[in-house]
UniProtKB/Swiss-Prot annotation:
Disulfide bonds: none annotated. It comes from Rickettsia massiliae (strain Mtu5). Its EC number is 7.1.1.-. This is NADH-quinone oxidoreductase subunit F. NAD(+) binds at G54, R55, G56, G57, A58, G59, F60, S61, T62, G63. The keyword tRNA processing does not apply. It is an enzyme of class 7 (translocase). The lineage of its organism: Bacteria, Pseudomonadati, Pseudomonadota, Alphaproteobacteria, Rickettsiales. InterPro entries: ComplexI_51kDa_subunit, NADH-UbQ_OxRdtase_51kDa_CS, NADH-UbQ_OxRdtase_suF, Nuo51_FMN-bd, Nuo51_FMN-bd_sf, Nuop51_4Fe4S-bd, Nuop51_4Fe4S-bd_sf, SLBB_dom. Keywords: 4Fe-4S, Flavoprotein, FMN, Iron, Iron-sulfur, Metal-binding, NAD, Quinone, Translocase.
C-alpha cells in the first residue's frame, strides 16, 4: 500500500486549484534550475535508475528511450507528449491534464532538456476541450513566469511547449500515427524502422512519451531514483494511476504502488464489487486492449510482469469490473465494434479482420452460430495478431482471445440454447 507522503499526484481529484500559485505550494517548480544544472546525462541516468517504465501501455524503459536520442544532432530534436487518451476504460491522463497541468509542463521542460529538444508538442485528444483549456492556461502562466520559453528557469536552455488538439481518432494514440497527424497528414501508423528517435517529427529525432510518464519525472529527480525504485516490485517500480470503473460501488481514479493486488485496489478504493466479491464475473485489468480475467484470477498483482503471467496485461491501468449480470459475450462484441470503427484501414488483416470478427461476435451473442466457428474465430484472431503495422490489430484480437480462453463454455451454451429454440 502506498504511503500518503509517497504520492506524486496530490491533487489528482481536484480538491485544490490547478493554477501556478497552488501548484508551487504542492512542490511543483521547486528549484527546477538546480535539476537542469545537473546536466542531460544526470537526468537520463537518474530516470533509468528509477526503473520508470512507460505508463501508456507498452511498459518500455523511459530512460532507455531517452538515451536513443542522438547527442549532437544536426537536425532539431523534438519531444512529443501523447495526451490522445482514447482507450475505453482509461481516464488517468485526463485527470492529470485537468488537475495537475504544471506537473506535466515541468516534466516536459526536464525531458526536453534531457534529450536536447528545444521544442515540445503536447498532442491532446480533440474531445478534451476543458483539459486543453487548462493546459493552455498553465502554459501561459509558465511563460509569463519565465519557467519555459527563452532561457527557461534562468538555465540558459530555451524550451518552447506547444499544445496541439487532435480530431478524435483513436489511431492517433499510436505514436507514429500521432506524428503523421501532427504534421498535418492523415493519422496512419508508419512502418518501423526507421524509429522516431532517428526519423520522427518532420524527419527529425523525436521522443514520444505518455502524459503520466512525463508528469512523474520532476518528482523522481527531486526525491531521487532510489526512492522511486523502492516503491513497488523489482522491474515494476514506482507508483501508477489506476482507473476503476464498471460494476463497483465507487468508480474512481487512484494512485497506488505497482504490484498492489487487484482485489485490494477494488475493495479499498472503489467500495468493492457491486453485490460483493462473490458477484464478480470478470475484470479487464488494463484498458479495453488486454484480455479479460475471470474471477478465479482476479487477485493478481497489478504490474507488468504479474499480469503477463496471468495471460493479460497492465496496459493503461484501466480496470473495468463486470459482475454476474454482465452478458460477457456482448461486452466483448461491443469492444470488437469499437476496434472495427477505429481501424485506419491501412493494413488488410486489420481492415478486413476487425469487421469480420465483429460480425461473428454478434452472431455468437445471439447464439446463431456453429460451435466450430469458435475455433475459426480464435484462429483468425491469431492471424491478425502480429501481422499489422501497429498494435491495433493485436488490441482487437486479444479481448476475443481472452473471452474464448475463459468463457468458451458460456459461448457454447448460448449456441446450444439457440439451436434448441
Amino acid at each position: 500500500m502506498l504511503k500518503e507522503e509517497d504520492k506524486i499526484f496530490t491533487n489528482l481529484h481536484g480538491q485544490q486549484s490547478h493554477d501556478l500559485k497552488s501548484s508551487k505550494k504542492r512542490g511543483d517548480w521547486e528549484n527546477t534550475k538546480a535539476l537542469l544544472d545537473k546536466g542531460r546525462d544526470f537526468i537520463v541516468e537518474e530516470v533509468k535508475k528509477s526503473g520508470l517504465r512507460g505508463r501508456g501501455g507498452a511498459g518500455f524503459s523511459t530512460g532507455m528511450k531517452w538515451s536513443f536520442m542522438p547527442k549532437n544532432s544536426e537536425k532539431p530534436c523534438y519531444l512529443v507528449v501523447n495526451a490522445d487518451e482514447s482507450e475505453p476504460g482509461t481516464c488517468k491522463d485526463r485527470d492529470i491534464l485537468r488537475f495537475e497541468p504544471h506537473k506535466l509542463i515541468e516534466g516536459c521542460l526536464l525531458a526536453s532538456f534531457a534529450i536536447g529538444a528545444n521544442n515540445c508538442y503536447i498532442y491532446i485528444r480533440g474531445e478534451f476541450y476543458n483539459e486543453a483549456s487548462n493546459i493552455q492556461r498553465a502554459l501561459d502562466e509558465a511563460y509569463k513566469e519565465g519557467l519555459i520559453g527563452k532561457n527557461a528557469c534562468d538555465s540558459g536552455f530555451d524550451c518552447n511547449i506547444y499544445l496541439h488538439r487532435g480530431a478524435g481518432a483513436y489511431i492517433c494514440g499510436e505514436e507514429t500515427a500521432l506524428l503523421e497527424s501532427l504534421e498535418g497528414k492523415k493519422g496512419m501508423p508508419r512502418l518501423k524502422p526507421p524509429f522516431p528517435a532517428g526519423f520522427g517529427l518532420y524527419g527529425c529525432p523525436t521522443t514520444i512519451n505518455n502524459v503520466e510518464s512525463i508528469a512523474v519525472v520532476p518528482t523522481i529527480l527531486r526525491r531521487g531514483a532510489s526512492w522511486f525504485a523502492g516503491i513497488g516490485k523489482p522491474n515494476n517500480t514506482g507508483t501508477k494511476i489506476f482507473c476503476i470503473s464498471g460494476h463497483v460501488n465507487k468508480p474512481c481514479n487512484v494512485e497506488e504502488a505497482m504490484g498492489i493486488s487487484l482485489k485490494e485496489l477494488i475493495e479499498k478504493y472503489a467500495g468493492g464489487v457491486r453485490g460483493g466479491w462473490d458477484n464478480l464475473k470478470a475484470i479487464i485489468p488494463g484498458g479495453s486492449s488486454v484480455p479479460l480475467l475471470p474471477k478465479l484470477l482476479c487477485e493478481v498483482e497489478m504490474d507488468f510482469d504479474s499480469l503477463r503471467t496471468a495471460g493479460s496485461g497492465l496496459g493503461t491501468g484501466g480496470i473495468i469490473v463486470m459482475d454476474k449480470s454482465t452478458d460477457i459475450i456482448y461486452a466483448i462484441a461491443r469492444l470488437s465494434k469499437f476496434y472495427m470503427h477505429e481501424s485506419c484501414g491501412q493494413c488488410t488483416p486489420c481492415r478486413e479482420g476487425t469487421g469480420w470478427m465483429w460480425r461473428v461476435m454478434m452472431r455468437l451473442v445471439k447464439g446463431n452460430a456453429k460451435k466450430s466457428e469458435i475455433d475459426e474465430l480464435l484462429n483468425v484472431t491469431k492471424e491478425i495478431e502480429g501481422h499489422t503495422i501497429c498494435a491495433l490489430g493485436d488490441a482487437a484480437a486479444w479481448p476475443i482471445q481472452g473471452l474464448i480462453r475463459h468463457f468458451r463454455s458460456e459461448i457454447e451454451a448460448r449456441i446450444k440454447s439457440y439451436s434448441v429454440v
